[in-house]
Amino acid sequence: MGFIYDWSEERLEIQSIADDILSKFVPSHVNIFYCFGGIVLTAFIFQGASGFALTIYYRPTVVEAFSSIQLILYHVNLGWFIRSIHRWSSGCMVLVLILHISRVYLTGGFKKPRELTWISGVILAVVTVSFGVTGYSLPWDQIGYWACKIVTAVPEALDDLLPGAGKLLVLTLRGGFSVGQTTLTRLYSIHTFVLPLVTLVLLIVHFSLLRKQGISGPL
């Protein structure tokens, strides 16, 4: 082990990186309310782990989606537990995210020079809501189907500003004029690939900015 550490240290300077991370100054005014961002990240990790486990058995087809959820809940070992983690951690993530945004706003954490940190955080909030919107329809039950139909019709309101743009966006989301298999496939792809990738990139940006600028001071 010593040889591996020495070899890695010589090339990567691991110790200096660890010292920089562990020796970061934490302002004295920081309290429990500054932990909301970390809780959101923890919930996202739970979401990713439980979501990956669910993809093993979930089938993104209009015929088998609902039955695959029933399989997970009632026949797969600990399937009900994994889905419960995914479901409840999503609610926790949204709730704590609201608290996190409120704390940052009320303490002035969005002010100069932290505007970019705030902007990246707001975009992350939008992505988080998008996770909920796309994931809600994946079971493809009655609630999921009608929620999908309503949500995918919302962009049509853009036609008032840009004629034709809203309808084009609706067709893109649905993959046609009606909600069906193509819609479910696109929602599944967005939920399991596009949004996680975007989130990871934004998290790197968000934490890099936070690391560079530090925690905002008290009011």
From Swiss-Prot:
| Cellular compartments annotated | Plastid, Chloroplast thylakoid membrane
Q: Which UniProt keywords apply?
A: Chloroplast, Electron transport, Heme, Iron, Membrane, Metal-binding, Photosynthesis, Plastid, Thylakoid, Transmembrane, Transmembrane helix, Transport
Cofactor(s) needed by this chain: heme b; heme c
Biological-process GO terms, alphabetical: photosynthesis; respiratory electron transport chain
Q: Which CDD domains match?
A: Cytochrome_b_N
One GO molecular function term of this record is:
electron transporter, transferring electrons within cytochrome b6/f complex of photosystem II activity
Annotated binding of heme b 2, by residue:
H86, H191
Record: residues binding heme c? C35
The UniProt similarity line reads: Belongs to the cytochrome b family. PetB subfamily.
Q: What does this protein do?
A: Component of the cytochrome b6-f complex, which mediates electron transfer between photosystem II (PSII) and photosystem I (PSI), cyclic electron flow around PSI, and state transitions.
**Protein name, as recorded:** Cytochrome b6
Please tell me the species this chain comes from: Heterocapsa triquetra (Dinoflagellate)
